[in-house]
From Swiss-Prot:
Binding residue positions for UDP: 276, 328-329, 346, 350-351, 354
UniProt catalytic activity: kaempferol + UDP-alpha-D-galactose = kaempferol 3-O-beta-D-galactoside + UDP + H(+)
Subunit structure: Monomer.
Keywords of the record: Glycosyltransferase, Signal, Transferase
Activity relative to temperature: Optimum temperature is 50 degrees Celsius.
Signal peptide interval: 1-30
Record-annotated active site: 16, 113
Name of this chain's protein: Kaempferol 3-O-beta-D-galactosyltransferase
InterPro entries given in the database record: UDP_glucos_trans
Family: Belongs to the UDP-glycosyltransferase family.
Any one GO MF annotation of this record: kaempferol 3-O-galactosyltransferase activity
pH dependence: Optimum pH is 7.5 in the forward direction and 6.0 in the reverse direction.
């Protein structure tokens, strides 16, 4: 087994590389004699490998494809993704050859973020197994797998005014709102680097030797059943926030969030956190502040200082008795505190899983990517939260959502029961004989038999 060498290809944007590394660390721990070479940009690797790691995980830097002196303009992250993909396959193949020479071990398996769609071609050229990781929900993978079917049934670029139309032909989905499909399926720029990447991925991922997913089977039974029938070894091995929780020793609470929560009533606090890549525009920040003030809802808000200037004048002073704004919060600890009654977020997949793990209902304000689809599932399928009225924060819409989720009435009870049920299912899935634990064992076996 000491000759096994897994090439791991990371997607170096947002939280993707960290999620892939978390799974690799679990595999490296289970397979101490297998070498895992983690191919990633130097910038991403340097942020991930800050503490000692397993001896059998070897970080290997590759180029990000950005020309010297390049200035990020209006294209933003999309442009950087395009530059990365332009040379990624060649850069990775060269790096893999160097890693093989350095280690004296040929590649026996290619593991990758599913966004690295060409990793399947690399595995095929090497005649080894290919294991792409899908870091989001089974449902969002499904719509990319069925993009051609959706485009056949829905005229591309023709959805304006039809956003509320209900689709019933996508396998695994009883119903799906047309406007809840991710951008790039039938709306938005279908030729952008990101849209093209997702389309290619959806068309090629069926060739995978195994397809691990950052979710648990009990969350999406009909979708999982359909995808299991389409793929070899479709393996839900998450939620990663439960299987690979961050080491508590590294978590600080420099702003005293937990001590502040200790003084609040049980289930009364709205925790607001939009992650690292999505912040509402100024008018929505102002509307949220007005709603919190008028409703006198206790709140803990994780927000960078530079955004505070958009609040109504005097807001911080007037709400100081029941509100706290910090530039960073220990989110997992905050959500698991008994005083928190709702999590207001962008409906990114990591945030949804953290809500489920903590048993805290959600108010969603989706922005891009899979956010709209996640919001649909949260509100209409799992019934563990609500999407903000109209999809953007207004004062009245925010007050309505807060009232729906925090009021001690039938709706609040139903939300808490639903998310409590999914919390229990998630914990059982990652338990000793749970579905995710059993799927992980299968993945371990596949790693050592896929060359």
């Amino acid at each position: 087994m000491s000759n096994y060498h897994v090439a791991v290809l990371a997607f170096p944007f947002a939280t993707h590389a960290g999620l892939l590394l978390g799974l690799v660390q679990r595999l490296a721990n289970a397979l101490p004699n297998v070498t895992f070479t983690f191919f990633n940009t130097s910038k991403s690797n340097s942020s991930l490998f800050t503490t000692p790691h397993d001896n059998n995980i070897k970080p290997f830097n590759i180029s990000d494809g950005v020309p010297e002196g390049y200035v990020v303009g209006k294209g933003g992250i999309e442009a950087l993704i395009g530059l990365f993909f332009k040379s990624a396959k060649e850069n990775i193949q060269n790096a893999m050859a160097a890693a093989v020479e350095e280690s004296g071990k040929k590649i026996t398996c290619v593991m990758a973020d599913a966004f690295m769609w060409f990793s399947g071609e690399i595995a095929e050229e090497l005649s080894v197994g290919w294991i792409p990781l899908w870091t989001s929900a089974a449902g969002s993978l499904s719509v990319h797998v069925y993009t051609d079917l959706i485009r056949e049934n829905v005229e591309a670029q023709g959805i304006a005014g039809r956003e509320d139309e209900i689709l019933t032909f996508i396998p695994g989905f009883a119903e799906l709102r047309l406007g809840s499909l991710p951008s790039g399926v039938v709306s938005g720029d279908l030729e952008s680097p990101f849209s093209v990447m997702l389309h290619k991925m959806g068309k090629t991922i069926g060739k995978a030797t195994a397809l691990p997913v950052n979710s648990f089977e009990e969350l999406d039974p009909p979708i999982v059943e359909d995808l299991k029938s389409k793929f070899n070894n479709f393996l839900n091995v998450g939620p990663f926030n439960l299987t690979t929780p961050p080491p508590s020793a590294n978590i600080t609470d420099e702003y005293g969030c937990i001590a502040w929560l200790d003084k609040q009533e049980p289930g009364s606090v709205a925790y607001i956190g939009f992650g690292t890549v999505a912040t509402p525009p100024p008018n929505e920040l102002k509307a949220m502040a007005e709603a919190l003030e008028e409703s006198k809802t206790p709140f803990l808000w994780s927000l960078k200082d530079l955004f505070k200037s958009f609040f109504p004048e005097g807001f911080l002073e007037r709400t100081s008795e029941y509100g706290k704004i910090v530039s960073w919060a220990p989110q997992v600890q905050v959500l698991s505190h008994g005083s928190v009654g709702v999590f207001i977020n962008h409906c990114g997949w990591n945030s949804v899983l953290e809500s489920i793990a903590a048993g805290v209902p959600v108010i969603c304000r989706p922005f891009f990517g899979d956010h709209q689809l996640n919001a649909w599932m949260v509100e209409k399928v799992w019934k563990i939260g609500v999407k903000i009225e109209g999809g953007v924060f207004t004062k009245d819409g925010t007050m309505l959502a807060l009232d729906l989720v925090l009021s001690k009435d039938k709706r609040n009870t139903e939300l808490k029961q639903q998310i409590g049920m999914y919390k229990e299912l998630a914990l059982n899935a990652v338990g000793p004989s749970g579905s995710s634990a059993e799927n992980f064992k299968k993945l371990v076996d596949i790693i050592t038999s896929c060359n």
